Amino acid sequence: MRAAFIILIGGLSCLAISCAKDSPQPASIPGQLTDIPEGFDEIKYPSGNEFNMARWMLGKRLFFDPILSADGNVSCGSCHKPHLAFSDDVAFSPGANGAPGTRNAPSLANVAYHPYFTREGGVPTLEMQILVPIQEHNEFNTNIVELAEILSKDQSYIEMSQAAYERNPDPYVITRAIANFERTLISGNSAFDQYYYLGNKMALSSVQKIGLDLFFGKANCSSCHGGFNFTQYAFENNGLYESFDDPGRFRLNRDSADLSRFKVPSLRNVALTAPYMHDGSLLSLTDVVEHYNEGGKNHPNKSSQIKPLHLSEGEVIALVSFLEGLTDYSFITNKLLQP
């Protein structure tokens, strides 16, 4: 059960879809995979898992291969769809054999910059996070050791693994290859980026510019969603409910101050990632803005930042329009990142 495993390394969904059985040869590195957007930090690859095309190609194949799941039908890409900025459009993504999920699948865009993983931050590295969906009963419901044995019977996977890490498929290879691929899911070419970082003053509409001023000003969204990735990675209770079914970070550390506090998500590509919140309970961006405009519901751990905003109807529209301007269409149409 997820709650039991979270104490060890946490939870989050991975992704999937089937790939060709042929073993492709590593090619030269396309610029789209390594270029860092203006205003972004450099990506830090861990020692022993630095980027190269052999690792990336293996990771991509594994990411979209449903062989990772017990029933052979669910992959990382099943819950993290490229055209949705590697998120899903349902409240809870089904796992192997249709097992119901318990949390909304977050976007994986810019996951390379996250300092910890899962909604309660219980996993310190991207490589470790890969283990979570593999063994969760309501996700892949399998075992990484058994999975490695299955992959070791596939000659094409053996060849790709040797090219990438000079060893046959094993838990080390599986976790590192998928993480290597996921670190290239970089999104930083939205209308906002063109306006703010590249100086194209026509990139945002007049309404979106009003929304931008609200975001960083009156609405103070940037207090939680600041920085180039539109998150400070803090843990907050946003007053979604007076009583939450999900204990949030509390189930990791048993600290009552963390009851129903969750990691603040990035807002990049947020127009594509509905439904919203940890449980997918809000269906539209307007619903989200109205929730914060009303100041949320009473909860003893509600963030002090959550208070009535007193936005007019026109200001709500402008703020939503600005959030739509965070969509990176080049990211979601990049064929290199698709199956």
Task: List PLM regions with ranges.
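Bacterial Sec-dependent N-terminal signal peptides
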Residues: 1-26
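Periplasmic c-type cytochrome electron-transfer domains
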Residues: 19-339
